[in-house]
Amino acid sequence: MKSPKIKNNKMKQTDKTNSRENIEELEMLNIGMVGHIDHGKTTLLSKLTGKFADTHSEELKRGITIKLGYADTIIENSKGKKRYISFVDCPGHEMLMATMLSGAALIDAAILVIAANEGIKPQTKEHLIALKAKRVAQIIIIQNKIDLVTKEEAIKNYNDIKKFVKGTIAENSPVIPVSAQQNININKIKEILSELKIPERDTTSKPEFLIARSFDINKPGTKIENLHGGVLAGILKKGTLKIGDEIEIKPGIQEKHANQISYKSLKTKIVSIYRGTHPINKATPGGSLAFETELDNILTKSDSLSGTIASIPNTLPEITNKIKLKYSLFNEVLGEEKEIKIESLKLSEMIMLSVNTTTTVGKITRIKDNEIELSLNIPIVPLKGDSVGIARNIHNHWRLIGFGEII
């Protein structure tokens, strides 16, 4: 479905400080902001970028991140080295673990925020393991809110953090004392960000664009001739896409016929591409991206296409409700104050899976050794080798209990 009269009406550029060429030449990183609720992730992000990632009224009212927030910036270190950084602000609330896992699927490295006045919380542990499950190895630990504690308390908290990460993927990660509110050590964080390793990017394979958000950017009352098409936001996992390319989105939209639910893929054309507020001609892996398309906005408003995948038409696997995983479980439930031992998966058990930017619930239909087969409530695009977070409903909350890989 197409939106009327948008082909020559590209999204308005709001920041003209950099040309297309400059932006496309910069090294790019996706950084996840993770940690317990109210430890200062969003405030820290505002100091690093000059903007808040929370843009939803419900989030501003409640003071917590509910959906994934995004903020892009160009950082420059003391030697004049520049990088383009896309930050993904992941929810820290225990009931929003699925959204956090979706965010972890998008990132190259992470900033783990721990408040010095509160210390290590259950969600801190859960998020650290989630990063491991999503194969995120580069982590910067921020000891935030040092202005709220004494010197002795700060030293004790620092030692607690070092003890906490010993034996984990973050054992050798730097721990930076910070006060986001007072702008203490913000430049030190930027220095470290400028030196993180850039992952090897695959620009030659068929593209896989992971859609985390979708929007209608038109204001009420916009004249037809000024309408923009639906916007898709996320990251390009591999391949390249350029203005004018036709893309196919799967699973697409849900259709219901005679009480039977099916999914129909969507085909559209890329009208313009933005990295943050900067227009670019061609999208490559690294950094968050927004594609304006020819889709009718009714299909993209309110994140209705979040969790889908886009590529060149007829290149993605067929969607499926049946998948097979190789899996591994943790010893105990993370994110709980008291220890809860994780029991083995059971036949017919319902578990939640986080696959790239989507989540779905599935019923276990077969178990053999460390492999399971599931029947899913919502179909996925099965990309072999993709990491999958596994969660179980414990005390009415979905808790991360392990991870797997699509086989």
Predicted stretch roles:
Residues 30-33, 149-151, 297-407:
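C-terminal effector modules of nucleic-acid-centric enzymes and ribosome-associated factors
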Residues 163-303, 309:
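Conserved catalytic-core segments of large NTP-driven translation/proteostasis enzymes
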Residues 2-6, 11-16, 385:
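N-terminal pre-Walker A segment at the start of P-loop NTPase domains
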Residues 90-95, 105-127, 134-155:
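Conserved Switch II/interswitch segment of TRAFAC-class P-loop GTPases
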Residues 38, 44, 63, 89, ...:
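Residue-level signature of catalytic and energy-coupling elements of molecular machines
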Residues 10-98, 107:
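P-loop NTPase switch module centered on the Walker A-proximal segment
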